[in-house]
Amino acid sequence: MTDPMTVIDPAHGREQEGLWTRRLVLFLRIVAGLSLVKGLYHWAGIAGIGAPPGEAFDANPLPWQATTVFFAVIDLVAAVGLWLAAAWGGVVWLTAAISMAGVELLFPDIFGGRLWMVPAELALVVAYIGVTLMAARERPE
């Protein structure tokens, strides 16, 4: 009889990972942590944690509320997907990053004052593309 533990192949086999693949997984986990913090920040805004009196979630304009709920959900979903190094995690995170940059650039009156997020998100996207390409180059055909 076969041992069931030897039949199951790990999702990410350590013996066949290259240097850039390990770096990619590390990068994805770091970005997952950042996405988790961003998602929790938005949930704190929804829950009113740290908000001055009179500036609760329902006192803010509807566009701010909708955007905050969107990022509260998508950032946490992206964090899970990135942590698992799943392909859908990268797609969800790229959607969140591009959406955040778009909101900051095109609608500064909604969140306003955080233009530093645009180059930060852009730098992370460029780094993601670079590390992903390097990891793909080291895989055998």
Regions found by a protein language model. Give the residues of each.
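Topology signature of small-to-medium multi-pass alpha-helical membrane proteins
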Residues: 2-141
